[in-house]
């Protein structure tokens, strides 16, 4: 019913990714600054005293919980917006989510995730207009 997308990508791509997600109606997300490395394994930097290796690079971790039917479009949007065609662009994980509860209201499921103008509301309006 719901999935959590966890995307880890370059810090400088955050604004582009957020704008691309907003354009498709993804308005709720959590963003965390993280450090890590994958295949890239870090970078070597040259300083006044020589070179040194930085093995944990700064990255952004973006978390979004959304309806199953919006997962592929969201993944494609993040991938296109975050891509630089260089090693170390990042990775996207998708996890199942059993339950969603909005703390302030007690709303559960879809109602706990819905926001004015979000992707599901846009799709609902488009379906009504088509009828």
Located regions from the model:
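Positively charged, small/polar-rich N-terminal and surface patches that mediate targeting and assembly
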Residues: 1-131
């Amino acid at each position: 019913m719901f999935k959590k997308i966890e995307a880890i990508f370059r810090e400088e791509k955050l604004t582009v990714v957020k704008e691309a997600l907003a354009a498709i109606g993804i308005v709720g997300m959590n963003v965390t600054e993280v450090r890590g490395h994958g295949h890239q394994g870090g970078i070597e930097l040259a300083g006044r005293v020589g070179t040194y290796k930085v093995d944990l690079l700064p990255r952004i971790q973006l978390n979004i919980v959304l309806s199953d039917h919006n997962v592929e479009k969201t993944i494609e949007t993040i991938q296109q917006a975050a891509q630089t065609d260089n090693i170390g662009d990042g990775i996207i994980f998708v996890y199942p989510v059993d339950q969603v509860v909005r703390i302030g209201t007690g709303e559960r499921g879809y109602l706990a995730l819905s926001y004015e103008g979000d992707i599901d509301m846009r799709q609902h309006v488009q379906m009504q207009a088509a009828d």
